[in-house]
Amino acid sequence: MAHPQIAVFARLADGNAQAVRRIEGQKTMLARTMHSIFYDAVHDEIILPNAFSAAVLTFRGDADGEEAPIRVIQGPKTGLLFTDQLDVDPIHNEIFVPMRNDEGGVIHVFDRGANGDVAPIRKLGGPDSGISGNRVTVDPEHNLLLIDVDGGLGIFNREDSGNVKPMRIITGGPKSGTTRPREAFMVPGTRNFVATTRRYGATPKSQVATSNFQTPAEAESFIGVWSIDDEGDAPPRWTIAHNIFKEVRNLALDPKNKTVMAADKGLNAILTFSFPEAFESATATR
């Protein structure tokens, strides 16, 4: 069982590096596994979900040791169930939490400063939306949401509410040679987003499989760059990190240094790639 903690490392840490600080202990309310974390540089806060307690936790940016969160969204009014993922819009001060309930996939939107047992300010979901309840990415610059939907990555307006269809869907397919984009992460100052994908036609995991992919060749995963204007079977403009990943889980960007960081569960590592092309504002195809 993993030790519940948020470990903070130096940006240039390499190899078997030691964390410079850790948020850990009973008061933190952290769970043994957390699949999403957001650093809000505007307000210097760390926001993440606790799936097991159906909560959203917010910590000070420089929190250390056994420190309690400064805000907790939790309770029956929230409607939260198994809150495994989230994204934050620090410009419009909103938190987006995808999940599944009895009616299917839905996105609950909360005020960023919400605390306690509070109702969401709006909900996005319904049969027409096709929302899976797995992931959501906010694009505050262009007022958009990138959401996992049936058949691909759906593009919605940020303020959409209720049973709304996506404006367009990026599907992957034989033309692009990729599956749908996943783990999307917007590139600031551009219309680009970085995401993970797999080779089109790669063998999917069995629904009953309990093991991870064992080799990079088996996983066939890599990182690509798409545009928010793409639709259908659109190819990525650039790709990197072929034949490296086993179980890539999440991405993060460092715009200042033009690098992409990827967490890999199978490798038990965080990998950093120089990827200056992803930060170009041009939309020419590869």
Enumerate the predicted regions with their spans:
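Blade-level signature of beta-propeller repeat domains, shared across WD40, Kelch, NHL, RCC1
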Residues: N250-R286
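A short beta-strand motif characteristic of beta-propeller blades
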Residues: A19-T28, P69-K77, A119-P127, K165-P174, ...
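An edge-strand/N-cap motif at the start of beta-rich repeat modules
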Residues: M1-R21
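Structural motif
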Residues: A2-A7, A54-F59, E103-V109, G152-F156, ...
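Beta-rich, blade/repeat-based domains predominating
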Residues: Q26-H43, P76-H92, P127-N143, G173-R191, ...
